Each structure stands twice: as structure tokens, then as C-alpha cells.
Amino acid sequence: MKPTLRRKLEALAERHEELERLLSDPKIASDTDRFRTYSRELAQLAPIATTLAEETRTKADLAAAETLRTDPEMRELAEQEIAIAQAHLTTLDEQLQRLLIPQDPRDECNLFLEVRAGTGGDEAAIFAGNLFRMYTRYAERQRWKVEVESDTPGEHGGYKEIIARIVGRGAYSRLKFESGTHRVQRVPATESQGRIHTSAATVAIIPEADEIADISINPADLKIDTFRSSGAGGQHVNKTESAIRITHLPTGVVVESQTERSQHANRDKAMKRLKAQLIESQRSQQATAEAMTRKLQVGSGDRSQRIRTYNFPQGRITDHRVENLTLYDLPNIIEGDLDPLIDRLRQEHQAEELARLSNAP
């Protein structure tokens, strides 16, 4: 481990000890807000303190085993103990480095999934449908709930656009690296000459805003329209203008909801999406500014970035953000087996974050 990372760990361990002292102070215990804040921080630092303590014990075991190695009768046993201790120290070192990576506060959020057909006409819409189905299948494997917010079907299948809310523990942490342009190479069903076409679709993963998220929306900045729903809900949706479309005038962001029976419920859902969109826009602008000073490919979330190619004739899927990340398992991946891809992307992101921490003052 680099000295800079070790110093950060030592500082966090000292902070953990300080928090334990503070929480034992009767004055702090009587202050509900401070006690809650310190308790939360202590809980976040506890894994680091526990792992550091285990590392200290393992180093002591290693030193004892090295002392025994000088005894001819104990040498063989000592060599075994040394090997075990060294392997465990390597594991603990890796764990400590991972624990240094700041947790994304949005990781446990629900999310909005937006899939839109790009270049490629009807084939792009069909591919957008394939992607949405892929994410839906993955959500089913994770026991997450998928709620379609709105959709515009393609003329020959798939979707020109489909927006859904995904509800489940850790949903955003698993899918946040899916934002970007996805490209497909295959022979369309309508292609009589058997030629391979290239089409594209864009994916946006937007974390649902926390109820106490720090963003204010001026009602005067909103244009709210009602219209008759064309979505689910039976004949009722065609009788009343229950669907809601909200335009945020300063940014031009437009959201709508038509899946609920009441206008009030649709307005609440649309406002949640608008809030999430505006917060994500702020975060994206900040991330773009940071990217000007450092190269962080995996976690950029740039929707214009071409992130992945799905080559059906070769059964190949390539993620362009990670060197040599090509899997010849497209049939299973398109059916929702995304973990091999997601795990590699998370590992790459962790490596990038560790490199950034190592170079930080």
C-alpha cells in the first residue's frame, strides 16, 4: 500500500477513537442531533477500525512465527504460519484499500431508467426494446420492481423511448455505469440481402432524488399540462385528462406521467422525476468539470459516450471503457446476465478511485 493511503487510514483510525470518546461524553449524549451525527460517522468508520485491528494482530502473529523459525524443531510449523499470515495480510491490505474509497451516497437509491432509440430507424427502436428487456430481466434476478412510467412504441417493435422506475436495494449501485450510447451490429429482420447494419440506442440511469435532497424548484418555473392517458388503466384513462406533463422552463426539461388513475398521483410521480433529472444534471455538470482535470472513464456517466457494442453475428459484447473487456457471451447477457460486465466495471472504477486517492495530497 502506498504511504499516502496508509496515512489516510491512520487518520481515519484516530477519528474513530475520537468519536468513541465524544459519544461517551454525557453532554453529547444529551444532544440528539450531534449524537446521531457522530454515531452515523462512527458506524461508517467501524469497518476500517476493525480491519486495522485485525491487521495489527496478524502482524504480531507473523513476528511470532518468524521468531520460531530460528528453532530447527519448529521451523516447518513456523514456515506454514508465516505463509498463512502473509497471505492474510495481503487480503487485509486489499480490503483496507477498498474501504478507503468513498461510498456514493446514491448507491442505495431507486432509479429511473431511460432508453431511447438512436441512429438506425426501426432497427434502433427494436434494439432499444432489447436493452429494456435486458435490464428488466436483470431486475427480476435481483428481485427489484420495475414500473413503466411512459413509453413510445416503435412502428415495427421495440420502443422509440421508454422510461421506467426501478425500485430495489442497491439498484443504482449496480446499474449506474450503464449510462451512455449502446451500439448494435447485426442483420435486421427486414434486411433481405443479409447485410450487417449498425444501430444505436442511448441509456440514462438517473438516481431517484432523496426526499430531503437539497434542491428547490420555483413553481413559477413550471408549465403543467394535462392530457388523456394512452397507457395502462383500462377505459378509465380515456375518459379523463389524468396524465400530467411538466416542463421546467429554465432548463427545458420535460417529464410526464400517465400510469396512475388520478391527476394528483401522476403529478407526484412527474415531480419526482423532474427533481431527479435536475439533481442529476447538476451532478453531471460537476463531473464534467472534474473530468477536465483527470481521466475517469468508467464513472463519467456521459450519455453521449459510446460505451458498449453488441455484435450478434459473433456473439460478442465489448465495453469500450475498459481495456480488453470483451465477452463472447452475448446471448446470456442480453437475457439479463449482466453481473460479469457490472462486476468488471465496478472493479475498474475502484481502481480509478484508488489511483486518484493515491495521488491526492
From Swiss-Prot:
Residues 283-306 are annotated as: Disordered. Pfam families: PCRF, RF-1. One of its GO terms (molecular function) is translation release factor activity, codon specific. The modification N5-methylglutamine is found at Q235. Its main location: cytoplasm. Methylated by PrmC. Methylation increases the termination efficiency of RF1. InterPro entries: PCRF (IPR005139), Pep_chain_release_fac_I (IPR000352), Pep_chain_release_fac_I_sf (IPR045853), Prokaryotic/Mito_RF (IPR050057), RF-1 (IPR004373). GO terms for cellular component: cytoplasm. It is found in: Cytoplasm. The keyword Protein biosynthesis applies. It comes from the Bacteria. PROSITE patterns: RF_PROK_I. The keyword Cytoplasm applies. PANTHER family: LD18447P. Belongs to the prokaryotic/mitochondrial release factor family. HAMAP family: Rel_fac_1 (MF_00093). This is Peptide chain release factor 1.
